[in-house]
Amino acid sequence: FPEDELTGKQLTENNCVACHEDKSINLASIDTMALGTQRELVAVMTEGKMQEQAKHLSKAEINKIATYISSAEHALLLKCSRQLTESDLRSGSNWTSKGNGPLNKRYQKNTNINSSNIKNLKLKWSFRLKGWDARSQPIAIGNLILAATKDTLYALDSDTGCAFWTFKSPSAFRVSPAYDKEAGLFVFAVDQELITYKLDLLEGKLVWKTQLPRESEWNLSSGSISITNSHLIIPISTVETIAPLNPMYECCTTSGGIAKVDIQTGELIWYHRIEKPAELVGKVRVTRTKKYAPSGSAVWNTPGIDLTRNLVFFGTGQSLQSPASEFSDAIIALDLNTGERVWSTQTLAGDAYNVACEVPMARQWGCPVENGPDFDFGASVIKSFTSNKEEIFLAGQKSGWAFGMKPSNGEIIWKNRIGMGGVLGGIHTGMATDDERLYVSNSDRASLRKYDWDPKPGVYALNIDTGEI
């Protein structure tokens, strides 16, 4: 058949099935993607991770694939019968950002839930999020829950699950919104295309929006906003890691970064690019395609803000092309006022990796010489205190190693390996502390790679002073 006469089923079989039904690649299956709406699937192919794989398809063909995979055009919504008021914001406990504060502790002091009564919890209501995955964590302000998913931010009543208001973005929301009481009755969000929004908290009306620096279509938001009463700190990631599956793609030029934005005006105060501009470093032997480095060092996690030392602190991902950079797989601290690098501590050198390393055919043209092991810092770095009240940064890596560091210079105080590690963790996300212990989730999910440890998935409590379990 000519391409324009192929059915949605044929187009899906020709373009999607080989990878999405291969369980070793860890992609969403066709059945899983069927949980999404047609609009969401189109967005994945036109502006998301699959844009490189779908660029040879016409708009009509993309729509056919989306329509074949999913029958859902849009999700239904139950609207509240009353308006949101300030009194709704004063009841209950708050969780105001991904890290529940600029130190990323992810700890709730004001709760009645404990190990004795958690078994008594019962489902009160449920709310169907768009799509097949939940990319961001909701935040809570009194009786209000703010949940961002795909192209919509929902303001929900915690008693009933109805929506007070919704705000739609032209692009997907992948990360948590943020709120700070001192900044007023406003909520802040950033979408996949790095457009940042300030919204009226009670009505969801737009106050301002700002386009953050986006050097490439591969740059996007993946870590959430960190906030104080005067500024936003926003991480910038890159998904160029998937592009080298194309044998003619010139890998790679993008970099992770951090942006600081004024809360009142939306003005960009500074932007810190992790890597220097990429340079030509050679050509692929098989295809003669050009190779560029340094690249990568994505910031997947939510940055912390240390107001005592005037620092922004965060972790980075792997390099995308060899030779690997000194700033990949590192914990970095920036000056809060200027965005200049204060210190950087790399925990693993020589880690250059992209998705081509996982696909046998693509490995010959797309995989960097160093070939991984892809040990990013995906979990947010935490600022806490030792038993002697000394400040400490706590970090966890996909390698399965946890670290305690000096906030002043990044010196490693202790390190402890709790898991096998892997391309999917290791310590991928989900660390928290009550300033007595560091709680760490360890994945150790199986992949095609072999490691020198047996998998030890689970949740671990570590001594903050020593890192001991």
PLM regions: where:
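Extracytoplasmic electron-transfer domains, predominantly the class I c-type cytochrome c fold
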Residues: 18, 25-74
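Blade/loop signatures of beta-propeller domains
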Residues: 82-124, 274, 279
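Extracytoplasmic/lumenal domain signature
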Residues: 38, 115-130, 153-173, 179-218, ...
